[in-house]
C-alpha cells in the first residue's frame, strides 16, 4: 500500500486512526480535518473552479481567486501567500533550457495558452486581470497533446469570459519603507479587455527596488589574535520601470496569433559607506572608505506565438522570442581622510550586453484515438558581449582616463564575445493508456556550438540526447501518483566565461573567467503523489527525487604558479543529490474556521560531490539541506477582511563553499511576515504588508588560508552579518 493510499484509507467514514496513522497525519499536515462543502467540479484529472466558487471572498483580480484554492497559493510576496525571500529558495540544480522545457512545477496558462516570452510570467499577469472577467480556473493534473506546455507537474488554466466587448482598468499604488527611514512610492496601472476577436493587456509599472543593508564584520588572525572590525552600510536606490503588452487576435476559429512585448529600465545605483578598525595597532587605526556604484540597465523583449488548427484536429505552432539586456556598471572606491578629502584608489568598469533569439516550430497530430505526437525543432542564438576595465592606485600601468585616471591594471579575459548556436529537434508522444493511466515520452537531440572571441579565442561543439518519461496514474479522481525519468542539460551562465566584478569579497576585485566551461547535466528520477481531500478540504502532496549529475560546476584550480593562485567556475566531476518535498494545504473547518487556509512545506535534501581541493566528499556549493515554510490566509467575508502570516526557515549549518584559498558557510535567521487586507464597499483594497517583522540577519563565516586551502595554514577568520531590518509596505488596489 502506498503512503497516500494508506493515509486516505484512514479517512473513510467510520474509520478510526491508529497511533501510527495519527503520526503520519501529523507529519503530513500537522492536524486532522473534516469536510468543507464548496462548489467544485471534478472532470477526471482536471479540477474546475467556476467563478461562483469565489463569490464569498469578493476577489478583485484573478490572482486573488487563485490564492483561495488549496495548494495553489501562487500569489507571491505582497499578495497574501508569499514566496520565500531571497536566499530561501531550495534546489539550485533543477531546470533545463529553451522554450519547450517544462518547469517540472506548476505552469500557468490563460485561455489554454502560455505567454510567449521569458521576462513576462503568466503568474504576474493574473494580478492585472479583473476577477469579473474570469469564467473558471482549471487545475489540470494530467498530461495531453492538447496542452500548450510539457513536463509540468500540473497546469493552472485561467479561462476568461467570451464577450464581444469588455474592458477593465486595474491599478495599484504602493509605498515601501526601509530601515533608514526612506519611503519609496510605486505603482502599476493595467488596461485589459476584448474587442471581438482581439484581446489585449497593456501595463505600465514603476516599482522601487530600494534596499538598505547594515553589515557588521569582525575577524581574527590565524593565531586567534584580534585583526579588525568592519561596519558597512550599503544602500541601493534601484528602480523597475516597465511598459509591457500582451495582444491576441483570432483570425478564425482555428487560427490565432499572440504577441507580447516588454520595455524596461532597471537601474540600480548603489552607495557604500565603510569603516574598518585595525585592532592590530595601538591606538587602533581607522580606514574610512566610500564606494559609488552607478548602474544603468535597460532591456526589451518581443515574443510571438501563432497556432493553426487543421480540420482533422492537427495543430501547427510557431513560436519565437527576441530579447536584449544592456547592463553597465562601475565601482569607484574612495579613501576618506581626516580633513574629509577623498582619494580614488579603485575604478572598475564593466559592460555586458546579452541577446537571445529563439524560434520553435512544431506539428501535433493524433496517431491513434488515444495517442498524439508532436514533432518539431527549436533553434536558439545567445550572445554575451562583455568588457571590463580595472584601474588601481597601486597598479603599475600607465594612468588611463577611462578608469578615473588611475594606473591601468591588465585583467586576463576582460574583453570577450561569447556566442552559442543551439539546434534541437524533438519528438513528444502522449498516450492515454486507459482512463486512469497516461504516459508522456519525449526525445530531444541537442547540438550546440559555443564560440568565444576577443582576449580569448575558442570554439567547441556539444551534443546531448535528452529523453524523458512522465507516467501518471489516477488511482482515484482525487489521488494521483506520478513518476518521471529525464535527462536535463542545465543552462550555462555566460558570465562565467569572462572576467567579472567580485562583489562578494572586499579583498578581491575581479573573478577570472573560464573559456572551457561545459554544461552540467543530470539524470533525474522523481516520484510524486497528490491527494485532494474530499469536499475541497485541502491537498496533500509528496515528492521524492534522486539525481545523478555530470560535470558539476564549482570552483576549480587553474593556477599557473604558486605565487598566482587562481580559481574559476569549472567542471569538477560527477555528483548526486536526493531528497523529499512534503506539502499540505488545509482549510481549517475542523476548528470552525473554514475560511482559514494553512499551507506548509517541508523540504529535506542532500548532495555529494568530490571536492577538487581537499579530495573529500562534500555537498554542492551553497546547497541547502532543506527548509520549512508556513503561510496562512484567514478570510472574514462579512468584514471584507483577510490577514495572514508567512514563515520561512532553512535547515542551517549545511551551506558550504570550498574555494582554492577560502572556506565559507552561511546561516540565517528565519523570515517572518504578516499582512492584513481590507476592502471597502467600492471594491478598493487596502493592504499592510510587513515582509520582515524581525531583524532577519543573514550571516557568513569565512576562513581564509595562507596559500592553498589544502595546506591548512589559517590566515584569517571572518564573521559577517547582514541586517535588512523591518520592511513594511502599504498598497491600495482596485479596478474600474
Regions found by a protein language model. Name each.
Residues 179-214, 225-272, 293-315, 469:
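Transmembrane beta-barrel wall of Gram-negative outer-membrane proteins
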Residues 62-65, 95-98, 108-109, 125, ...:
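N-terminal periplasmic accessory domains that precede
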Residues 545-548, 568-656:
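Gram-negative outer-membrane beta-barrel transporters
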Residues 291, 295-299, 352, 418, ...:
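Outer-membrane beta-barrel signature, preferentially recognizing the C-terminal barrel domain
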Residues 115-141:
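Short acidic/polar hinge/loop motifs at secondary-structure boundaries
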Residues 38-40, 63-118:
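Extracytoplasmic beta-strand/coil segments of soluble accessory domains associated
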Residues 4-5, 651-656, 676-736:
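C-terminal beta-signal and adjacent terminal beta-strands/loops
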Residues 244, 248-266, 293-454, 458, ...:
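Face-selective signature of the C-terminal outer-membrane beta-barrel domain
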Amino acid at each position: 500500500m502506498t503512503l497516500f493510499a494508506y493515509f486516505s484509507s484512514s479517512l473513510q467514514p467510520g474509520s478510526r486512526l491508529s497511533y501510527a496513522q495519527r503520526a503520519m497525519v501529523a507529519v503530513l499536515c500537522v492536524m486532522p480535518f473534516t469536510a468543507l462543502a464548496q462548489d467544485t467540479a471534478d472532470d477526471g484529472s482536471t479540477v474546475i473552479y467556476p467563478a461562483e466558487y469565489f463569490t464569498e471572498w469578493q476577489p478583485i483580480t484573478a490572482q486573488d481567486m487563485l490564492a483561495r484554492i488549496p495548494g495553489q497559493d501562487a500569489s507571491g510576496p505582497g499578495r497574501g501567500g508569499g514566496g520565500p525571500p531571497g536566499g530561501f529558495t531550495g534546489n539550485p540544480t533543477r531546470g533545463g533550457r529553451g522554450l519547450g522545457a517544462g518547469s517540472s512545477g506548476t505552469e500557468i496558462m490563460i485561455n489554454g495558452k502560455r505567454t510567449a516570452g521569458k521576462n513576462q510570467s503568466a503568474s504576474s499577469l493574473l494580478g492585472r486581470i479583473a476577477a469579473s472577467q474570469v469564467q473558471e480556473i482549471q487545475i489540470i493534473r494530467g498530461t495531453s497533446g492538447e496542452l500548450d506546455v510539457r513536463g509540468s507537474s500540473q497546469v493552472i488554466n485561467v479561462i476568461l469570459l467570451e464577450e464581444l466587448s469588455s474592458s477593465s482598468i486595474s491599478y495599484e499604488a504602493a509605498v515601501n519603507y526601509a530601515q533608514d527611514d526612506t519611503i519609496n512610492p510605486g505603482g502599476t496601472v493595467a488596461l485589459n479587455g476584448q474587442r471581438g476577436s482581439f484581446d489585449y493587456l497593456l501595463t505600465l509599472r514603476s516599482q522601487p527596488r530600494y534596499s538598505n543593508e547594515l553589515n557588521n564584520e569582525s575577524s581574527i588572525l590565524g593565531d586567534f589574535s584580534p585583526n579588525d572590525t568592519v561596519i558597512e552600510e550599503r544602500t541601493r536606490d534601484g528602480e523597475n520601470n516597465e511598459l509591457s503588452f500582451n495582444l491576441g487576435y483570432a483570425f478564425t476559429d482555428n487560427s490565432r496569433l499572440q504577441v507580447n512585448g516588454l520595455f524596461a529600465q532597471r537601474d540600480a545605483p548603489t552607495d557604500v559607506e565603510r569603516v574598518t578598525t585595525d585592532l592590530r595597532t595601538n591606538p587602533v587605526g581607522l580606514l574610512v572608505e566610500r564606494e559609488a556604484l552607478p548602474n544603468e540597465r535597460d532591456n526589451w523583449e518581443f515574443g510571438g506565438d501563432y497556432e493553426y488548427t487543421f480540420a482533422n484536429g492537427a495543430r501547427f505552432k510557431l513560436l519565437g522570442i527576441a530579447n536584449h539586456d544592456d547592463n553597465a556598471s562601475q565601482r569607484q572606491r574612495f579613501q576618506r581622510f581626516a580633513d574629509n578629502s577623498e582619494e580614488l584608489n579603485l575604478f572598475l568598469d564593466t559592460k555586458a550586453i546579452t541577446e537571445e533569439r529563439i524560434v520553435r516550430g512544431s506539428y501535433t497530430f493524433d496517431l491513434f484515438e488515444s495517442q498524439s505526437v508532436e514533432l518539431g525543432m527549436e533553434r536558439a542564438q545567445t550572445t554575451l558581449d562583455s568588457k571590463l576595465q580595472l584601474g588601481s592606485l597601486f597598479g603599475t600601468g600607465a594612468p588611463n582616463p577611462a578608469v578615473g585616471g588611475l594606473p591601468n591594471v591588465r585583467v586576463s579575459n576582460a574583453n570577450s564575445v561569447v556566442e552559442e548556436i543551439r539546434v534541437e529537434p524533438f519528438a513528444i508522444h502522449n498516450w492515454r493508456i486507459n482512463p486512469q493511466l497516461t504516459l508522456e515520452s519525449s526525445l530531444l537531440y541537442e547540438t550546440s556550438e559555443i564560440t568565444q572571441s576577443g582576449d580569448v579565442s575558442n570554439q567547441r561543439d556539444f551534443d546531448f540526447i535528452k529523453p524523458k518519461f512522465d507516467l501518471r496514474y489516477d488511482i482515484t479522481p482525487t489521488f494521483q501518483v506520478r513518476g518521471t525519468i529525464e535527462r536535463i542539460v542545465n543552462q550555462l551562465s555566460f558570465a562565467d566565461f569572462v572576467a567579472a566584478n567580485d562583489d562578494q569579497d572586499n579583498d578581491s576585485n575581479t573573478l577570472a573567467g573560464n573559456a572551457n566551461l561545459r554544461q552540467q547535466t543530470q539524470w533525474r528520477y522523481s516520484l510524486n503523489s497528490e491527494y485532494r481531500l474530499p469536499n475541497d478540504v485541502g491537498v496533500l502532496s509528496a515528492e521524492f527525487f534522486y539525481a545523478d549529475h555530470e560535470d558539476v560546476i564549482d570552483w576549480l584550480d587553474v593556477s599557473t604558479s604558486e605565487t598566482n593562485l587562481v580559481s574559476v567556475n569549472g567542471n569538477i566531476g560527477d555528483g548526486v543529490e536526493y531528497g523529499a518535498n512534503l506539502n499540505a494545504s488545509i482549510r481549517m473547518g475542523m476548528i470552525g474556521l473554514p475560511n482559514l487556509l494553512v499551507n506548509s512545506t517541508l523540504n529535506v535534501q542532500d548532495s555529494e560531490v568530490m571536492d577538487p581541493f581537499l579530495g573529500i566528499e562534500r555537498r554542492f556549493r551553497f546547497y541547502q539541506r532543506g527548509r520549512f515554510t508556513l503561510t496562512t490566509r484567514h478570510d472574514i467575508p462579512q468584514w471584507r477582511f483577510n490577514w495572514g502570516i508567512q514563515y520561512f526557515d532553512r535547515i542551517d549549518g549545511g551551506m558550504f563553499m570550498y574555494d582554492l584559498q577560502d572556506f565559507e558557510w552561511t546561516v540565517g535567521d528565519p523570515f517572518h511576515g504578516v499582512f492584513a487586507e481590507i476592502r471597502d464597499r467600492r471594491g478598493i483594497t487596502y493592504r499592510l504588508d510587513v515582509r520582515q517583522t524581525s531583524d532577519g540577519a543573514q550571516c557568513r563565516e569565512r576562513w581564509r588560508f595562507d596559500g592553498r586551502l589544502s595546506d591548512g595554514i589559517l590566515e584569517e577568520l571572518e564573521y559577517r552579518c547582514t541586517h535588512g531590518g523591518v520592511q513594511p509596505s502599504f498598497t491600495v488596489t482596485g479596478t474600474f
